[in-house]
Amino acid sequence: MELKEKYHLQSIFALSRAEDIWAAIETILYSSGRKLHFKKRGDLPEIRAKQSTRGLVIDSSQSGLIVKYGKVTIPCKYKAKDLWLWDEEKAILAYLAEPELQDAHAVDQMSKGIITDTYRPCFASLVCKKIRGRLRVYVHITVEGKAISKRRKDSTPRHYYGKGNIGCDIGTQTIAYTSNTEVGLENLAERGNSIQHVERQEALILRAMERSRRAMNPNHYNENGTVKKGHKQWNFSKRYQKLRQRHQELCRIATENRALAIREQVNHLRSLGDCFITEPPNAKKLQKRANPENPVDKNGRMKRKKRFGRSIKNRCPGYLQAKAKQLFESTGGMYVEVPILYRASQYDHTSDSYIPKKLSQRMYHLADGTKVQRDWYSSYLLYCINKTYTQINKLKCRSNFATMYQKEKNMIEEIIRSGKKIMNSGIRTV
């Protein structure tokens, strides 16, 4: 009663939020989580009801889908050019027109061993976002079944799916891949010069915010410039608040660009094959700061604890790996993570031996003198996996190497010719 009378909320919203809280507690009790993360002051809310008939009710009208919250009716609008959303709305409306018939058909097909997509709306969420200074509210509808394939205006598929193995070596900033038809070495999450431009702009804004914060709160700092300990009441000027809004908008645009770039890369990889082979993800481990046993070097200076946090934040290799797994498994493909003993970065097929290499050694020579790029060669060894997906197929390595090596040389020549800088690749373009 208190929830309804004091906050004007139904119990279904509390139930939905309780599930999120319990999921977070489970990560602390039974997984690698360490602490709970609460909403910050100023964060926009997300309203979700885990039932489509309570709280946020999903219904149909003459104009299309609508979401009802009490006496408030929210029409679902989208751009007319978005054919995928049009197809999705059409499928949801078809279910809402005859839900009993659609459910009976799905149960009948399941008894025959066939799983069909009903497009039943499960629940809805209202997500608030601030875009270019304006508050926008989006309706997220969770639908039962697989998403409809995207198409063009002439009804042809927007994305095509290939066949065959794709060996991918995913680094902190780059991705190297080898398939039956193409080899490649690219920067992760890059759309033009977006990352370099955003980094520069973000540094300038943060520097200006720091100057403003120090000018408005001079008593909060020691003589050496460090912040005093203890609880403090901070004063922020109007200029600081405007800079903070600019910084939030810049981070939002950078996030969107990273997500779009990664989805484009994953869709391209899916067009090359249907079996994605890679190593287990380790971005979370590389993101943490180093903790050396002896923190002091031989000269008496403190060792640096910096690792790959900034690169992983800008390039998001873990997000690419998660999206690849989701796309390949949902479109009839396979996602394979090789065992730790596979050691694609150490094997040399010309001498049939494992040779450890320094992390800084990006270009190296095989035992027979052939010069290869390290990341691409690792992706080639992942491509040459056996039928049980556990070990390297040495016969396949030897028989296909000449063809793939020529493609690798053509790829490096194209990178040098275009002048594109591939991070940590060892390829000099100037």
Describe the role of every protein-language-model region.
Residues 1-131, 310, 314:
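Acidic carboxylate diad motif detector
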Residues 120-122, 133-137, 164:
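Residues at beta-strand starts and edge strands
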Residues 137-430:
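Positively charged, helix-rich recognition surfaces that bind polyanionic ligands
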